[in-house]
Regions:
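Conserved AMP-binding/adenylate-forming
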Residues: 2-3, 10-29, 33-133, 139-142, ...
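Hydrophobic/anchoring residues in structured secondary elements
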Residues: 5, 170, 217-218
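Conserved donor-binding loops in enzymes that form glycosidic bonds
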Residues: 7-8, 221
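Conserved beta-strand segments of alpha/beta enzyme cores
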Residues: 25, 71, 167, 215-217
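Active-site and channel-lining beta-strand-loop segments
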Residues: 71-77, 220-227
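AMP-binding/adenylate-forming catalytic core of the ANL superfamily
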Residues: 98, 104, 124-211, 221, ...
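Acidic/polar alpha-helix N-cap and adjacent early helical turns
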Residues: 238-249
């Protein structure tokens, strides 16, 4: 059995649950309205059958490869849109090109593409030598703390791995020293007694110490769009200055 997940990145804990509890393989797919809608799907190559189950699981966490007719590339905006190598390590702005990819929006005269014909998705990602795409974050949701980038998606996936967390969103909160720091907005599972410190301790040894969020704020619900995506702009408006309030300049 298998299922397909798209819309947002599937936490590793969910992929593991589908496999372990239901013997169901999960296929990651990615796309946008602007890509009509498929941009990539995760089907492992024949050579990957030689990998261990753990290595294949890690590869399945990616959003996979583009279908025939679609090209992907990564660029560095700070270096004049210079293309970034496909090494699975370097992150860049994800751009896409193909015959069914948008070239302009309805009612707009100007092109939606770069000068050389690519559509900028607004995602930050890596590409490996086989073309497997791994989206790190939306560019607007990346957290820049002391000059270093922190992925909100990675922190959310870790939080969702906690047995007492039902839903979690990570946002950038303004900080008087580091400019921005990550905070977790979380919904507990029913009857959970987990504490803020308990969730923060859960991050220990899973990521670098400087990436561990500064706060965990428990809420009854997280605002969602009509398609079920978390509305981080509303969370930023409500909680974006919480660290300034506790650490006034």
């Amino acid at each position: 059995d298998r299922n397909v997940v798209g819309g947002s990145a599937c936490p590793p804990s969910m992929l593991a649950a589908f496999k372990n509890d239901y013997n169901c393989d999960t296929i990651h797919a990615w796309g946008m309205t602007e890509t009509s809608p498929l941009g990539s799907a995760n089907q492992l190559k024949a050579k990957h059958q030689q990998l261990s189950e753990q290595e294949r699981f890690k590869l399945r966490l990616s959003q996979g490869r583009p279908p025939f007719g679609v090209d992907l590339r990564l660029t560095d905006e700070e270096k004049g849109n210079h293309e970034i190598a496909r090494d699975g390590e370097q992150i860049g702005n994800l751009q896409i090109k193909g015959h069914w990819i948008i070239d302009s929006y309805f009612g707009k005269d100007e092109s939606a593409l770069t000068t050389d014909g690519w559509f900028d998705t607004g995602d930050i990602a890596t590409l490996d030598e086989d073309g497997f795409l791994c989206i790190s974050d939306r560019s607007k949701d990346l957290i820049k703390s002391g000059g270093e980038w922190i992925s909100s998606v990675e922190l959310e996936n870790l939080a969702m791995g906690h047995s007492d967390i039902l839903m979690a969103a990570v946002i950038a909160a303004e900080h008087p020293k580091w400019d921005e720091r990550p905070i977790v907005i979380a919904v507990k599972k029913p009857d959970s007694t987990v504490t803020e410190q308990g969730v923060l301790d859960y991050y220990t040894d899973k990521i670098a110490k400087w990436q561990i969020p500064d706060r965990v704020i428990f809420v009854d619900s997280i605002p969602l769009s009509g398609t079920g995506k978390m509305l981080k702009r509303e969370l930023r408006a409500q909680y974006g200055q919480v660290l300034l309030e506790q650490n006034p300049v």
